[in-house]
From Swiss-Prot:
The lineage of its organism: Bacteria, Bacillati, Bacillota, Bacilli, Bacillales. ATP binds at residues 7-20, 101, 162, 187-188. Pfam families: HIGH_NTase1 (PF05636). It comes from Bacillus velezensis (strain DSM 23117 / BGSC 10A6 / LMG 26770 / FZB42) (Bacillus amyloliquefaciens subsp. plantarum). This is tRNA(Met) cytidine acetate ligase. GO terms for molecular function: ATP binding; ligase activity, forming carbon-nitrogen bonds; tRNA binding.
């Protein structure tokens, strides 16, 4: 029984994701698709529109067989660490391949780029430091460094988010010594950050444009770009909790957190670098919204994404020393199981003795500082939900067993 690994956020799960899962199984000749999915907060620092449990249900109804959670210590991170955590979890799970979307769908440039980087890693690191000193953002500086070492090759366009992530997935496979084989497929129709839904007959749209349509016009506006299960779960979540989460919902909590921190305390928060704490404390007194705060803080050096991640770490009070300690091991310390189909359950039963990290189904049965941070992130995520629903939401984190879905009878067995 072969499993293909997917690295996902499903914010929300849309038709493009369903196509991705289908192609992953076909192109890798795998019977099981295993997804490692970000929890409450995502790689760019924003909150997921709905909970990880709602997104797990969307995935299980649409071709994904196993969903595990990417711990917070990897989920809200730059591409390199996001990829390292994701790849290590899929390796722990025994996946034989990893499948990701890219701009042109050819794996060779990714493999060549990873090999070239290995040969010239010191040169690349030196150029990267020089470009950062000039005031460039990390992505821009990295792109310049990679351009230098990839001269004369079929160079990747590292200005594209999916290509950046793909490069780091392949790098993580190579550096970890995993036997997983990387595969890629070309993204179809919509670009990653397209803000508007396509006007043609396409049924594929970017998650960004779908979220925008949901917030502005409701589920009906995006329904043709979503599987039925996703539309249903989105509506059910809002009916239950009165919200689809967005960054603006957390502005008052960011403001409160900053009002209780001194500049010295703020400087110890992860991602607060180089005197940025003084700029943050000045800005928060003037800003009247999350967007205004971000516009005032953003510079060529400090990108929107980096600042957004920083704000999330401020909300969770994640200190540099704690994050560095938790990231010191080379691989993820546990596998948090969120859901599985019958086929996924059969795979896990067959592989149980071969898993290279503890499989966590109940929070009460396992303890780890990184898991404590996952729980804290879930509590922070629930802050904009009104009572008594917020308390019910928080209880679900401890009481919810992995979701089980019978793909033959098309029904959930415990959700």
């Amino acid at each position: 029984m072969k499993a293909v690994g997917l690295v996902v956020e499903y914010n929300p799960f849309h038709n493009g994701h369903r196509y991705h899962a289908e192609q992953a199984k076909i192109k890798t000749d795998s019977s099981v698709a295993a997804a490692v999915m970000s929890g409450p907060f995502l790689q760019r620092g924003e909150p997921a529109a709905v909970s990880k449990w709602a997104r797990t249900k969307m995935a299980l109804e649409n071709g994904v067989d196993i969903v595990i959670e990417l711990p917070y210590i990897y989920a809200v991170q730059k591409a390199e660490l996001f990829a390292r955590g994701s790849v290590s979890l899929l390796h722990h799970l025994g996946c034989s391949s990893l499948f990701f979307g890219s701009e042109n769908g050819r794996i060779e440039p990714f493999i060549e780029a990873s090999e070239a980087f290995s040969r010239k890693e010191d040169d690349c690191s030196l150029i990267l430091k020089e470009e950062l000193k000039k005031g460039l953002s990390y992505p821009a500086a990295a792109s310049k460094a990679f351009s230098h070492i990839f001269k004369g090759r079929d160079m990747l366009d590292l200005s594209k988010p999916n290509n950046i992530l793909g490069f780091h997935y392949v790098r993580a496979i190579h550096t970890s010594g995993s036997a997983m084989k990387p595969y890629t497929t070309a993204r179809i129709a919509s670009q990653y950050h397209d803000a508007e839904l396509p006007g043609d007959n396409s049924r594929i749209a970017s998650a960004t444009s779908i979220r925008k349509a949901l917030i502005e016009k409701g589920t009906a506006a995006a329904r043709s770009f979503l599987p039925e299960a996703s539309a249903r779960e989105l509506e059910a979540y809002r009916n239950s909790y009165g919200i689809w989460h967005s960054t603006e919902d957390y502005f008052s909590y960011v403001k409160y957190s900053l009002s209780t921190l001194s500049a010295e305390e703020l400087s110890r928060i992860y991602e607060v670098e180089e005197g940025l704490e003084h700029r943050i404390l000045r800005t928060i007194r003037q800003a009247r919204s999350y967007r205004e705060m971000m516009e005032r803080l953003k510079t060529k050096r400090y990108t929107w994404t980096r600042l957004q991640r920083m704000n999330t770490h401020i909300l969770t009070r994640t200190k540099k020393e704690d994050m560095h300690r938790l990231l010191k091991p080379s691989s993820a310390p546990y596998i948090r199981l969120l859901g599985m189909t019958k086929k996924g359950q059969a795979y896990l039963s067959a592989k149980k003795k071969e898993l290279t990290a503890p499989l966590v189904s109940k929070l009460s049965s396992f303890s780890h500082p990184a898991l404590d941070l996952d729980i804290l992130a879930g509590r922070v995520y629930s802050l904009p939900i009104n009572e008594p629903e917020r308390t019910l939401f928080e209880k679900q984190e401890f009481s919810q067993a992995p979701i089980r879905y019978d793909e033959d009878e098309k029904r959930f067995l415990n959700a």
